[in-house]
A protein has these predicted regions:
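Nucleotide-state-sensitive switch-loop elements of NTP-binding domains
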Residues: 1-21, 26-29, 34-222
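C-terminal lobe/tail of nucleotide-utilizing enzymes
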Residues: 1-14, 225-350
Length: 350
């Protein structure tokens, strides 16, 4: 390449068309801190717009990151009025799904009902499917809210996802195309089963409602599929640390994302020591920094057309809005150990 991309997420933060930002990577590399930092910077840079941060990771950490309890409903972040957070609870969502199924069919002996209960309890990736249904719900709400001028309705400019570790995330992102095919087959099946059920005395209003709902879901899924593959609307931020396994996982994930035609052009590398710029570095720090630099050099060569953001290792956990505000600045303005070391050592313990 004739030019080098900025080692920051400034371009992403300023982009005014993005609706969906996914943040993902291997477990334990700082996904929640990174997704929270991106959300905080978006809220700070665009104070007149609303943003939503959703955790789809079953091991929810948003409440810990912001020192504030979040649940399945969007709740405003204290100290940042235009940012809301929510944590999707698969078990609660499963319970809601089964209750909704009860509305369509109250016969406990119906074999179709038994099959549906077995399916929802045993499908691999059901957590991801339920998380995805929450996404569909938000798309529907967005459409309604954009047409509604009342002040109590919130239309989010961008929704940021703090995702589960890589395997779960890739299954989650496969769902739009998988569901699209599955719902298409359901539609074909409903066309054949409908007349048969009527002849057998079944197929009342409840089943008509169910097929109508499937139609609506299919349209929403098709729309999500289009949005997820549009680089103006959706992007994925990879998070890793400068070690072999993390680099390997990141490359695997990027290849998968490209196969889904999803935009990915940013990588955040966390927990860097920058021992060269320390006046009195310990021997262990120097040895580890030497290893980190080796993999950083490989990343720089492998991902020369990506925004490669280098974030420092901190002396304490990043918790609370004020600490996130300080740390998230390095996503916009690259960390300089000679100038910024004082900032990361002065973070307040929460």
């Amino acid at each position: 390449m004739d030019f080098e991309l900025e080692p920051s997420l400034e371009e992403l933060i300023k982009q005014d068309t993005l609706k969906w930002i996914f943040v993902g990577g291997k477990g334990g590399v700082g996904k929640t801190t990174t997704s929270s930092s991106i959300a905080v910077q978006l809220a700070l840079q665009h104070p007149n717009d609303e943003f939503l941060l959703i955790s789809t990771d079953p091991a929810h950490n948003l409440s810990d990151a912001f020192c504030q309890k979040f649940g399945k409903d969007a709740r405003k972040v204290e100290g940042l009025s235009n940012l809301s957070c929510m944590e999707i609870d698969p078990e609660a969502a499963m319970s809601d799904l089964q209750q909704q199924a009860q509305q369509y069919n109250n016969d406990p002996n119906d074999p179709l009902k038994s099959i549906m209960n077995d399916m929802t309890g045993s499908i691999p990736g059901i957590d991801e499917a339920l998380s995805f249904m929450e996404v569909l719900k938000h798309i529907k709400n967005q459409k309604v809210n954009e047409l509604d001028d009342s002040k109590d309705k919130i239309s989010y400019r961008t929704i940021i996802f703090d995702t589960a570790p890589t395997g779960h995330t890739l299954r989650f992102l496969q769902l739009p195309s998988t569901l699209q095919k599955l719902l298409g087959k359901f539609q074909q099946l409903s066309g054949k089963l409908g007349p048969m059920m009527s002849m057998l005395g079944g197929g009342g209003q409840g089943q008509q409602d169910m097929f109508a709902k499937l139609n609506e879901v299919q349209k929403n899924v098709e729309e999500v599929n289009e949005q997820f593959t549009n680089p103006d609307l959706t992007t994925f931020v990879c998070v890793c640390i400068s070690e072999f396994l993390s680099l390997y996982e990141t490359e695997r994930m990027i290849q998968e994302l490209m196969s889904y035609q999803m935009d990915v052009n940013s990588i955040v590398v966390n927990q860097l020591l920058f021992a060269d710029d320390d006046e009195n570095p310990c021997k262990r720090c120097v040895a580890r920094w030497k290893m980190q630099k080796k993999y950083l050099d490989q990343m720089a060569e492998l991902y020369e057309d990506y925004h490669l953001v280098k974030m420092p290792l901190l002396g304490s956990e990043i918790r609370g809005v004020e600490n996130l505000k300080k740390f998230s600045k390095f996503l916009i303005k690259p960390y300089d150990p000679k100038v910024d070391r004082g900032i990361i050592t002065d973070l307040k313990e929460q």
